[in-house]
Amino acid sequence: MGTSSHGLATNSSGAKVAERDGFQDVPAPGEGAAGRICGAQPVPFVPQVLGVMIGAGVAVVVTAVLILLVVRRLRVPKTPAPDGPRYRFRKRDKVLFYGRKIMRKVSQSTSSLVDTSVSATSRPRMKKKLKMLNIAKKILRIQKETPTLQRKEPPPAVLEADLTEGDLANSHLPSEVLYMFKNVRVLGHFEKPLFLELCRHMVFQRLGQGDYVFRPGQPDASIYVVQDGLLELCLPGPDGKECVVKEVVPGDSVNSLLSILDVITGHQHPQRTVSARAARDSTVLRLPVEAFSAVFAKYPESLVRVVQIIMVRLQRVTFLALHNYLGLTNELFSHEIQPLRLFPSPGLPTRTSPVRGSKRMVSTSATDEPRETPGRPPDPTGAPLPGPTGDPVKPTSLETPSAPLLSRCVSMPGDISGLQGGPRSDFDMAYERGRISVSLQEGASGGSLAAPARTPTQEPREQPAGACEYSYCEDESATGGCPFGPYQGRQTSSIFEAAKRELAKLMRIEDPSLLNSRVLLHHAKAGTIIARQGDQDVSLHFVLWGCLHVYQHMIDKAEDVCLFVAQPGELVGQLAVLTGEPLIFTLRAQRDCTFLRISKSDFYEIMRAQPSVVLSAAHTVAARMSPFVRQMDFAIDWTAVEAGRALYRQGDRSDCTYIVLNGRLRSVIQRGSGKKELVGEYGRGDLIGVVEALTRQPRATTVHAVRDTELAKLPEGTLGHIKRRHPQVVTRLIHLLSQKILGNLQQLQGPFPGSGLGVPPHSELTNPASNLATVAVLPVCAEVPMVAFTLELQHALQAIGPTLLLNSDIIRARLGASALDSIQEFRLSGWLAQQEDAHRIVLYQTDASLTPWTVRCLRQADCILIVGLGDQEPTLGQLEQMLENTAVRALKQLVLLHREEGAGPTRTVEWLNMRSWCSGHPHLRCPRRLFSRRSPAKLHELYEKVFSRRADRHSDFSRLARVLTGNTIALVLGGGGARGCSHIGVLKALEEAGVPVDLVGGTSIGSFIGALYAEERSASRTKQRAREWAKSMTSVLEPVLDLTYPVTSMFTGSAFNRSIHRVFQDKQIEDLWLPYFNVTTDITASAMRVHKDGSLWRYVRASMTLSGYLPPLCDPKDGHLLMDGGYINNLPADIARSMGAKTVIAIDVGSQDETDLSTYGDSLSGWWLLWKRLNPWADKVKVPDMAEIQSRLAYVSCVRQLEVVKSSSYCEYLRPPIDCFKTMDFGKFDQVYDVGYQYGKAVFGGWSRGNVIEKMLTDRRSTDLNESRRADVLAYPSSGFTDLAEIVSRIEPPTSYVSDGCADGEESDCLTEYEEDAGPDCSRDEGGSPEGASPSTASEMEEEKSILRQRRCLPQEPPGSATDA
């Protein structure tokens, strides 16, 4: 609010000047023309001439008083001085005397403090000396100026990528061996002995230009890495010509993991469509895949691990790119596969009618969509069956597990008694990759397992609706036979045994007894949902009778598409079981269906006993993949970038798009002046470079790896081939590109384009804490309670998502005492990568010194939290000094801890000035338990109770957790004079509704209220202090005494300065509890200024400076003149968004613009307006005067910005009904407050009923990890929607190479692989239908055929030519 402390100035929420009948109305910024305030009359004020006269009169009176006092002083008779000399101290001698005296006291106190042999009787005296010492320090500190924050640029390690590549000469291994190791990702998961065994089979191959590496018809049984030269990977086009889909440069590889899997499983097939040729003379390294079989024969435990990595690559790389980003669904799966004919068979009974009276049959309809819970319900005999091993622990549980659980588990230093204490094998790593708990006995033995005895203490799971379960009974005669599904009694047992034999045959299980007590027979009614997409607890399903329909949710559409139909004899769910990833489709029984089920934990027990079982399961996955997926497996790369290496540099050619699988990347732009600026950071699941690749523009920024990062690489030629093969991909690309361009256009709708406002053009990219996966915690000193701090933070993070805490003790307990040795670095890196995949965020607690574990924590971190004690002297810890001397690329944040009963933050600037650039400095008010000194056992017992309760969302630790996970909630308060008092009422209602606030900002009166709330964090205390200030604003004498000659302004501003200073004293913005900013208008540079540090009262006053009434405030940093921020941005929600807020609650209290103005034609006479005004019988006209026109011109940019904010998706726009209050109605504080409070209660009550608040607090990554949320780093203001379709649908003509492997007439052969696997499609008659079926079965078959055709499950016609696309 731009006014002085008198009652004649107006608020900063408006600034119109309307001279009317000798009066002038001065609205605040954001206020419009006449009639904005609910029909309120103009506010009279003292004209300039009258003001000068009053000022002159006051000056005359003051002069007369001074003259009178001087005259009276001169008339006082002087007393004669006594005889003799008079001695007196000079002032300077007096100052020196007392100064020396104080310093003597200080030195004596200091020397006495150093003496350690102080007796107990001298302690009171020492306390007095300490108090004197503190008083002396305060006296000496008065002369010092308040320190200001030193402007620091990010260090070179943050903005610059390494210029040198990896030095292979420093390794004792041959260069070609390291070359193969670094460029084939699947080999990176081998341990060193296995990898060296493989490299014995590696050979060199030299190719001339035009020579083929392989072509259709030749075996696909090798991995190729280009050492020098250039290879081209080709696929046949629709006209029989080869189309180059990928250029393989030195360092890249040509391989298909599905082909490797086929060779390992013994189902090798020759190439059908893919060929590779040398574009110029080249040298390649060739590794035959047969070498894998020899290695696995020697190291059988590694077989499961490697197959698992191949499956993970298939799901994460191939499916992520093709389904999540390109929108392909049933094109990824083959619909032609030959199932087994299980029933009817000799010796088995025919189908009979179900027993309707059986208690196991639960009648449900298909419309109800009942779901089968994957578990074991009670046994029909009455004895409870235990659930499968590895039931996940609740996120808030802190019970000591019997084995380390990887899914939503809680670990702490005191909770290591139940952890395995030895090194893990490859199979144990596979267990953890599949998110299965490894028991201590099994992990120690590592040998073959018999069927383990079930733990009788485990509780049975709930009986699923719509499905019943049969568990084989040893004593069948005792039960008298159990009716099941279409069979009864002993018939079910016979079917069960026959089905297990068929399953053992399919999976090549040598010992069928491994299936005993691990296989369950299920029967599902029609319409039952067996498993849903996204489920974590998955199982294997072996269809016996009926069929299971597999559906997948379509991207950007609220519908599911049928991928395929699992017929009798087929396995479903093996991909999710092997990878440990969530299920990527939904299983539904369209009709009654019978199947065998093996839980994930039971399947891993079988694999431990016979590792080769994983080959059969993996082969069933590979056989279901379509030929198109096998082609894309060659084309889509799985690449890695080491920490500090550049993924690409600014100005490079854009030839591909990247998807981050894990790790972190940073984007930096170099301006024309050579200055480098941080654009943003990318985390897991982000899409990079899509706009540049589609528009074929050079790279706009340099992107380098913050830490070791894995990516999926989609080449440009591959994207063109996909568009030719599946034209519907163009729609998805238009959607992706339109999101990026739309985000740019919304930024350009502001008053100034791009970053001219001082705001980065992309909001989410500017948040350094967005999309974090790992956080390292580093102490400043040994006094920091690190264990308690990390546990408190973990407790707060658990409310957002699964969180894992790791320290050196936990690592040694889980992976063995030698886990941190350099020889175990590979295994530790792989295990940590698994933890990042299984958890929302991983906390790394460093040691107190620079140990190998501390170095590992810093290497793995996306962000580093430097934790200090706020009540201690600002110091730089020893570990921090080592950190400053190393090139750490992760962003740093300084976290200061404060006691709950202690004073507020102070001297934050000194903490920050001692360190290099920090991206943030949160203050945390900690509970008393954090600083209590307890033994590890007592601490463990205490936090067991803490973790049993849900974290308080209003605590500072919860606020830090929301910041780290990108779920910040910001509160933005607009300007509007006395109407801004309603902000406090809305704040009170916001507190009562339970909505936390993590960031506060505002303009004008909003900056004042926001600063109070950021300091107090209490609406009640904010109301009390704001009411006192509002009362002072009703004074009349102070404004009169503050009048001056109106050259720059009518008032000097000193009275208003005193009123603001009395509220905030010398508080710094850095010392506020909540992060805070306000907005001012820089009239020196004609730009908006956003203030996040510095003197609080000065920048609040600057944001409330109304033109003409208060002089501009000189910025103490650079001397620029600052005015009211409402002139340019009266509701800065966009600033809060650019600072990383996920949701912005914006409260607007500005007056509404008058838009109903009179039409007067092409010219206007002032005499006519005067007549209309003086004539009481004339119709009133609404025409703005000169002052109002100037005011509207001043607020054009503010109005535009407000409209953009109101229409944005991230902003919750609120406007209380306060239009009936005037700008200077500070005397009506309570009435305005009540209006805001009642309005807030109504709004937030609706939010609570509509579940809006819970959605605000829900982590966005947990809702939809597949959504591309990033605005791309490249912005093209000239790009519009008219040429959008042309950009994304442009298909380059294929390279005119005639393929020797296929003629024009053999196109169908080229586009179909594995013809020997082809069989009847999914619409054929089910082989599993028993003889003697009811006549309605045929009609059901026909009905199912039509359904499958409608859902695109049947084979489609081959796509058209490139012109059709």
From Swiss-Prot:
GO terms for biological process: lipid catabolic process; phosphatidylcholine metabolic process. It catalyses: a 1-acyl-sn-glycero-3-phosphocholine + H2O = sn-glycerol 3-phosphocholine + a fatty acid + H(+); 1-hexadecanoyl-sn-glycero-3-phosphocholine + H2O = sn-glycerol 3-phosphocholine + hexadecanoate + H(+); 1-(9Z-octadecenoyl)-sn-glycero-3-phosphocholine + H2O = sn-glycerol 3-phosphocholine + (9Z)-octadecenoate + H(+); 1-hexadecanoylglycerol + H2O = glycerol + hexadecanoate + H(+). InterPro entries: Acyl_Trfase/lysoPLipase, cNMP-bd_dom, cNMP-bd_dom_sf, LysoPLipase_patatin_CS, NTE, NTE1_P-loop_dom, PNPLA_dom, RmlC-like_jellyroll. The modification Phosphothreonine is found at T352, T455. A nucleoside 3',5'-cyclic phosphate 2 binds at residues 502-624. It is found in: Endoplasmic reticulum membrane. GO terms for molecular function: lysophospholipase activity. Signal peptide: none annotated. Residues 1-50 are lumenal. The chain crosses the membrane at residues 51-71. Residues 375-389 have a biased composition (Pro residues). It is an enzyme of class 3 (hydrolase). Residues 350-367 have a biased composition (Polar residues). This is Patatin-like phospholipase domain-containing protein 6.
